[in-house]
Amino acid sequence: MEFAFSDEQDMIRTSAEGFLAEISDSAAVRAAMASDLGHDPAVWRRLSEEMVWPAIHIPEQYGGLGLGFVELAILLEQMGRRLFCSPFFASACLATPALLLAGNEQSQLLLLDPAFLDFVINLSEFK
């Protein structure tokens, strides 16, 4: 069995690699680790608004990108390479699948909506 990434997945990796190289250098990682929040809210907002990564595997019917766990793993791999500090794992890897599995249609429509994502981003700025 041979496994190869698709062109779209290669594009995601290249894009993530470039973006994270810009925002998660050694100084940024150290500053985030030393902060009370453990991440830089401005960077988290930028990642969420520009790259839309927290919505990577939210189904399109809820306003997400509708991609799968392979694409999510590509992002996590690149974040690990750069020691990127953010609430990404908690939101995209834990909360989203939990809502998709356990939530009812009404809660999914509310909590997976991109407008709600902005609320979550704002919450991440407070300790």
Positions of PLM-derived features:
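Glycine-rich flavin
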Residues: 21-126
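Intrinsic disorder at enzyme termini
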Residues: 1-8
